[in-house]
Amino acid sequence: MTSYNRSVAWLTVCVLLALHIGGSHQQQQQCTTPTRLRGRCISIYECDSILDYFKQRILTWEEREFLRKSQCTGATSGRQPFVCCPGNGSKPVVAPATTVPAGTASTTPAGPAATAPSGDAALADQLVGGLLPNPKKNECGVSIGMRIYGGQNADIDEFPWLALLQYENRKGERKYSCGGSLINRRYVLTAAHCVIGEVERKEGKLVSVRLGEYNTKTEIDCVTEEQEEICADPPIDAGIESVIVHPGYQDMAHADDIALLRLAQSIEYTSFVQPVCLPLTDFRASKTGEVNFVTGFGRTLQESRSAVKQKLGIKVYDHARCQEKYATKNSSITTNQLCAGGEYAKDSCHGDSGGPLMKLQKVWYLEGIVSYGNRCGLEDWPGVYTHVPAYMAWVRSNIKE
């Protein structure tokens, strides 16, 4: 077994599964597998049929979901996860749609031609004929783990839709500045101020997008878990075929701060590069006080810019109060914007511009795009985000095969 496969297997075992730490000794309890076979609840290290299956490849969304559903609550020893192991020892068939328990999302192979369930015309329209991944089929928003000013390091394959925008100045020097979110194989959603206006004068021309990055200081990103080295695939650098800026955006203003980047190539999904879900018909917008997450490579308490992907949970801020706060700065907050944060030293800023504000609703949805704020991490001064649900019609009308 190669070092990489060992890494994938360990990552699968230690991160995808919730680990049950306890002292009971209910060894080999009977259980039912996700495909409704009788099995025994045992350590995954004793279940060759599951362990061998998941050591062989980079996991698809369906395989990730199957492994999660195979988890059971048996006895534990240290940090060993327990799974429902088929009684006949055969390799599992991964969760066909007809065997998924009622009330859970079905899982079918992901791909650009995926369509909505029959009879759901509204969702079919929202998916633009399959150009957007379907949240109901776990085709997006699947993150193994759970810039961030006051944040912490993300897991190596957490938030795999995060994109880094690269710019080139007149001297030919390149640097990363803004962020973005991969929404399908050809498009990244970001902030308009990251692609036109002052950013061009300050950073240079936008030339490429990097996907699957974890540590900008290393060529191959690796972390150590339980004395086992886990390494990511090399990041993907994609050229930009075209830039689509919302027609309402004006340089140095903040309204309609949203843009689409059409990549010059179709992106192949891996465990480290996947799309985030867009808010569709059944998405419930966040209320004041709810916790959403931001991720990126921006400023931290220790550094002007983080080399390692960061994450931070922040609360949605009362909209009316946010309008009042920013009115004192001669800045108008519209209903197409969302405010979040406002705790000291916990904010998204600088290098996080254009990056995602995410809401977990079974899968991860892109609810906001980092737009602007009043400095970084100030007490009772929330950041302002472009509210993505308000722009879904624009997004749908501007993507193509």
Curated annotation (Swiss-Prot):
Keyword Disulfide bond tagged: yes
- How is the polypeptide modified once translated? Proteolytic cleavage is necessary for activation.
Q: Which cysteines are joined by disulfide bonds?
A: 31-84, 41-72, 47-85, 178-194, 322-339, 349-376
The principal location of this protein is: secreted
Which parts of the sequence belong to the Clip domain? 30-85
Pfam families for this protein: CLIP (PF12032), Trypsin (PF00089)
What InterPro entries does the record tag this protein with? CLIP (IPR022700), CLIP_sf (IPR038565), Peptidase_S1_PA (IPR009003), Peptidase_S1_PA_chymotrypsin (IPR043504), Peptidase_S1A (IPR001314), Ser/Thr_Proteases_Immune/Dev (IPR051487), Trypsin_dom (IPR001254), TRYPSIN_HIS (IPR018114)
The active site annotation covers 193, 257, 353
Q: Which residues are glycosylated?
A: 88, 330
| Activation/inhibition comment | Inhibited by serpin SRPN2.
Gene disruption phenotype: RNAi-mediated knockdown in female does not affect lifespan and basal melanization. Simultaneous RNAi-mediated knockdown of SRPN2 and CLIPB9 in female, reduces the spontaneous melanization and the lifespan shortening occurring in SRPN2 RNAi-mediated knockdown.
GO-annotated biological processes: innate immune response; positive regulation of melanization defense response; protein processing; proteolysis
The secretion signal range is: 1-26
Keyword DNA repair assigned:
no
Q: What is its EC number?
A: 3.4.21.-
Query: What keywords were assigned to this record?
Result: Disulfide bond, Glycoprotein, Hydrolase, Immunity, Innate immunity, Protease, Secreted, Serine protease, Signal, Zymogen
- Every copy of the Peptidase S1 domain together lies at 148-400
Tell me where in or outside the cell this protein is found. Answer: Secreted
- Gene Ontology cellular-component terms listed: extracellular space
Residues carrying the site annotation Cleavage: 147-148
- What quaternary structure, including any partners, is listed in this protein's UniProt entry? Forms a covalent heterodimer with SRPN2; the interaction inhibits CLIPB9 protease activity.
Q: What does this protein do?
A: Serine protease that functions in the melanization-mediated immune response. Cleaves and activates prophenoloxidase (PPO), which is required for the activation of the prophenoloxidase cascade probably following the recognition of pathogen-derived products.
By sequence similarity, the record places it as follows: Belongs to the peptidase S1 family. CLIP subfamily.
What's in the domain note?
Answer: The clip domain consists of 35-55 residues which are 'knitted' together usually by 3 conserved disulfide bonds forming a clip-like compact structure.
Name of the protein described by the UniProt record = CLIP domain-containing serine protease B9
Supply the source organism's classification: Eukaryota, Metazoa, Ecdysozoa, Arthropoda, Hexapoda
